[in-house]
Amino acid sequence: YKGEKPAVIDFYATWCGPCRMVAPLLKSLAKEYKDQIVVYKVDTDKQKELSAAMGIQSLPTIIFIPKTGQPQIIIGAANKTTFRKAIEEVLLKE
């Protein structure tokens, strides 16, 4: 990963109910951590090749990509506490 900040990638679809539940949580966390991380959203219906290349089979799939180390994946809807823990422990730990 070559970005300047750790990243969160949210693979979603507009028709996906759990994706719609997760979206405002990630938006809120993106604001909260705006100086520390970058949040990307990928519509799997519009970005089929990227989704296939990343092996996305279930929605939502959220990938936490640290500057160094292995990415971590959460598949399915999770709560804000779970996402915050992943940001703190995977992306921001020193």
Model-assigned labels for residue ranges:
Residues 10-15:
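Aromatic-flanked redox-active Cys/Sec active sites in thiol-based oxidoreductases
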Residues 7, 48, 54-65:
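Structural micro-motif
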Residues 16-19, 62:
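The canonical Cys-X-X-Cys-His
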Residues 43-45:
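Conserved acidic residues
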Residues 20-33:
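Typically the conserved alpha-helix immediately C-terminal to a functionally engaged Cys/Sec
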Residues 58, 63-94:
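Non-catalytic, surface beta->alpha helical segment in thiol-disulfide oxidoreductase systems
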Residues 1-7:
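A short beta-strand-turn-helix
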